[in-house]
């Protein structure tokens, strides 16, 4: 199906065409691990970690650790990395043998040198001393490298959105260059007004559009948002509602402004109803297949 056929369909038929061409993934090879970030986070405490190698395999490891941290308290700053925590100040619930509960806070960024024993007790109870004594076999730098790679997997959801933004930006850049259009990534309403003298009504004062494209010949702006959902959930309903509302705000502009939504992912199969409602209000909803087939270029072309 080409752009003109798609855009001429009734909203239900456009939705069916959209759903039939959803991509199975947007995960590029770079999605899985950001090695630059892993390297950067590991190197932060390389010196401390190499010093802590001293504790590997020690018999009386509690006493050795207490002495080491008493003499070099700054080494404690590396502990959060060893227990896979991004937090540098930890709130801890302690439960004793009588089931009495108490709370404490240990700051691993600003070390309290009067509480070294408390730090070591926590490290012991967290299982780290046992690991160092009985399981660690080589460099703690290498170990933390692996920990950081695991922690980085938590950022994959963010990378999925970043991937879509990157695809959109590369696509828009090529089209704009070929058609003599101006464009801006992460464009704000204030930028659009100051640079192109186009009024953009928005639902949020700090709204940034993933891309804005401007035609000098038409004095027109296309506002583009993009996202990707590999799984279902309540967020998809909220997003569909948000962009439906945003598209209606955009239509109130006294200037020539058009809203475009580029979205994809198998998650939409679980949220068809709210997406159907969005299709009833937003004419230009495209997926990655449609981008690949030139729908965005055709959208700009039909009015230039």
From Swiss-Prot:
Cite the entry's keywords alphabetically.
Endonuclease, Hydrolase, Nuclease, Plasmid, Restriction system
One biological process term in Gene Ontology:
DNA restriction-modification system
Q: Name one GO molecular function term.
A: DNA binding
- Enzyme Commission number(s) of this protein: 3.1.21.4
Reaction(s) catalysed by this chain's protein: Endonucleolytic cleavage of DNA to give specific double-stranded fragments with terminal 5'-phosphates
Q: Does the keyword Hydrolase apply?
A: yes
What's the superkingdom here?
A: Bacteria
Query: What is the top EC class of this enzyme, as a single word?
Result: hydrolase
**From the record, what ranges are coiled-coil?**
none
Q: Which family does it belong to?
A: Belongs to the DpnII type II restriction endonuclease family.
Task: Give the note.
Answer: The LlaDCHI restriction system has two different methylases. Genes encoded on plasmid pSQR700 confer strong resistance to the three most common lactococcal phage species (936, c2, and P335). Its presence is probably one reason for the strong bacteriophage resistance shown by strain DCH-4 over the years.
Name of the molecule in the record: Type II restriction enzyme LlaDCHI
Q: Gene that codes for this?
A: llaDCHIR
